[in-house]
Every structure is written in structure tokens, then in C-alpha cells.
């Protein structure tokens, strides 16, 4: 029997192991999902304004961050591609560069949590599109694949497809551009690993 777990994708604890998981994380720099779903959330009384602010701070890909002594630089050691993107974007827009680091650091935490709850040789499928940050295309799937090796996974399969029906027609102005294809990344847990 399938069960939907509601909670934080970067910090959860389940009593049982599962054989597979699938996710579609937010695109970097794409939508403020908390803002987009704000009215529905308030109407259904699922959260109040204060709770929404707290949810937004914890959201994977949040743009609510304070650039300070940033403890998330270690993520750069997990992906040469991420390091390259970070260095290029930092010159143009320091805040956006740190948003990218935060996003991939959150994804690393998610990979570690899923690894801890997968059975040996379990499969984790991730559907994600690339993002365009300050004119630089970020191949999110590739960065996640590189990071996953540090979290006890191997890449088993990757393919992409063209998005034919952009059903979310929210005007993004010049922020991130139109995402035309999604990538499917299939990772397999290396037996005996726990991260």
C-alpha cells in the first residue's frame, strides 16, 4: 500500500525502509511555490501567514537567505560542475550564486535522507529541469548526479524529454527563462551504504 509522507524533504525519519522513491524538486530560480499556493493554503486553513513565512524559509530552493559566513561551501567539493557555475555567477550576482549553493546543499541533504531510508539497491528517480541563472544554463541533473556519488548512489539511467504542454503559465518575466525539457535521473543505492 502506498503512503504519502508530508514533511521536510531534507530532514525526515521513517520507521521502515522502501525500495524506491521519486521526486521532482523545484527548479532553481523558477517559481516561489509558497507564494503561488498562498491563497489556497490560507483558504483551506492549512497554515496561517506566520507559518507560511516559516515554511518559505525551509523550502528547497528558497531565495530567503542571508549571505553571511556561509557554511555550505563544502558542497563545491562534491561537484566540479557546480564549482564552475558558482564561480561564473558569483562575479555577476553574489546572492544568486549563494542561492545555487543553498539549493544543491539542500538536494545533498535530501539524497542523504533518501539513502538512509532506501533498501539496499533501492532506486531514487528525480525529475528536474535545467535552470538559466544570469544567462548561464545550470545542468541541475548533472550536478545532482555528481553529488549523489558522495551520498551512496550510482547513476543508473538518464534521459530527457521535451515539455509539450506548459500548463503552469505564470509569467516569470526575465527570471530564469522558459524551461523546455525535463531530465529524468535514476539513481541506485550502493548496497551497504548509509549517509
Outline where the language-model segments fall.
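Class I S-adenosyl-L-methionine-dependent methyltransferase catalytic core
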Residues: 1-22, 27-126, 130-195
